Amino acid sequence: FKVATKVTDLLDAAGIAYDVYDNIKPNPTIENVTSGVAACKAAGAEAIVAVGGGSAIDTSKAIATIMTNPEFGDVRSLEGVAPTKHPCLPIIAVSTTSGTAAEVTINYVITDAQKNRKMVCVDPKDIPVVAFVDPDMMSSMPKGLTAATGMDALTHAIEGYITAGAWELSDMFHLKAIEIISRSLRGAVDNTPEGREGMALGQYVAGMGFSNVGLGIVHSMAHPLGALYDTPHGIANAIILPTVMEYNAEATGEKYRDIAKAMGVEGTENMSQEEYRKAAVDAVKQLSKDVGIPDDLKEIVKREDIPFLAQSAY
């Protein structure tokens, strides 16, 4: 709440009335949204100030969308590309984590706890009208959360760079994001000012890219882990990313050379295709290890759940 107080103090000083809604889980649920809509109506809110990471901002997007499009009051109806007619209630996003880039993207994710699945919702009308990306607001994140959200941002950048819809403009965003994140995440985990500032920028740049082209199977497999086991999204992404990179390598042309170079690997111009592809994957594994991410799913996944997880990811 200390971080949120920085915002509420400003509202108090300006004489702006507000209510606080904080019933939000790390993997926000349908119930979090519906109770938030009720709170928003009760307050007569004209705007939402979303203070937090992806969970808070995603929940705010769903609430704000339903507020101006009441025919979508059933949260499940928002899944996919919902044909909403009106812009959502104005959202001012104040990011406190450096990973999701939810403050600049058109999508949000809500968990259907009854069905143990995550719903990806896409709506260009839900982008916040103002986004504050201030590394000082992110400086209170503990090391584990910094690492997890940072690897989430790297996953966004790498998946966005190799996705089928990638093109010149998105490539520009994603390669720069990979470079910034790779040089900044270790420092951010150690809470250095340079690391925090770099991650604030890097995750934002990645969001500007993938919001235009989409992501890949890392996310399709990570979402069921969050829905079934409440696994932190960034942890799931980080563990799965190297394996998916190996799986996708044959379809990526020379892009892994670019990824390896952006991650600081030297001599990529003299490497064979096999060498630079391995170098890119190894660089991701090393960064993940350096920031303390587990390297497998053994402590998370139950073997009997694998068929359900596979079907959910399809």
What do these predicted ranges mean?
Residues 31-136:
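Glycine/threonine-rich beta-strand-loop-alpha-helix active-site module
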Residues 304-314:
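Short, amphipathic C-terminal "tail helix"
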Residues 1-47, 297:
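ATP/NTP phosphate-donor binding region
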Residues 107-213:
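Carboxylate- and glycine-rich phosphate/diphosphate-binding segment that chelates Mg2+/Mn2+
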